[in-house]
């Protein structure tokens, strides 16, 4: 997937089997509270919540495509029973990830752009299906539709 090269964070569902084990000594209390609070909501409530909530676990993953150290968060907009319950997030190109990144001040790196021009001060995710690759190393200048 062309987007994953510039994933700036990862999110697990609060009920994911690894969620609690990813907490560090510094984040354990907040992580445990978040897991508990999320367990009190139904999946319907979680998907309808207008405001994104989450907690940083204190742990990181390594992005296999870029080698970048990627922070791991928990958020109840990810559900354990949908897919794997874990997602790599490219907030420049997904509305929910964009809202989450804006709220928690997580970097947003655009990787697909119309006519190869990066949007300055993004106010929403760029969700067009195709465009020119930017901020993507060897893929810069390539059309996303051929990757």
Stretches found by the model and what they are:
Residues 7, 12-13, 64, 72-75, ...:
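Generic beta-strand/beta-sheet core signal
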Residues 59-98:
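Catalytic-site beta-strand/loop segments enriched in glycine and acidic/polar residues
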Residues 7-8, 56-58:
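Short glycine-rich loop/turn motifs
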Residues 13-56:
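Amphipathic alpha-helical
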Residues 2-6:
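Conserved small/polar residues in nucleotide/adenosyl-binding loops
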Residues 1, 86-147:
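Residue patterns forming the tRNA-binding/recognition surfaces of aminoacyl-tRNA synthetases
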Residues 7, 12-16, 25-28, 105-121:
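Basic, alpha-helical terminal appendages of large translation-related enzymes
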Residues 13, 17, 50-51, 74, ...:
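Residue-level signal for pocket-adjacent positions within structured domains
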């Amino acid at each position: 997937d062309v987007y994953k090269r510039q994933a700036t964070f990862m999110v697990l569902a609060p009920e994911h089997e690894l969620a609690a084990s990813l907490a560090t000594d510094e984040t354990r209390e907040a992580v445990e509270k978040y897991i508990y609070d999320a367990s009190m909501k139904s999946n319907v409530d979680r998907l309808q919540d207008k405001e994104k909530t989450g907690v940083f676990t204190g742990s990181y993953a390594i992005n296999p495509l870029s080698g970048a150290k990627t922070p791991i968060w928990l958020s109840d907009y990810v559900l354990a029973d949908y897919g794997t319950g874990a997602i790599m997030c490219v907030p420049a190109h997904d509305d929910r990830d964009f809202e989450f990144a804006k709220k928690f001040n997580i970097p947003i790196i655009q990787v697909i752009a119309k006519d190869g021009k990066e949007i300055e001060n993004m106010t929403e995710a760029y969700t067009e299906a195709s465009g020119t690759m930017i901020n993507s190393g060897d893929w810069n200048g390539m059309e996303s539709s051929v990757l």
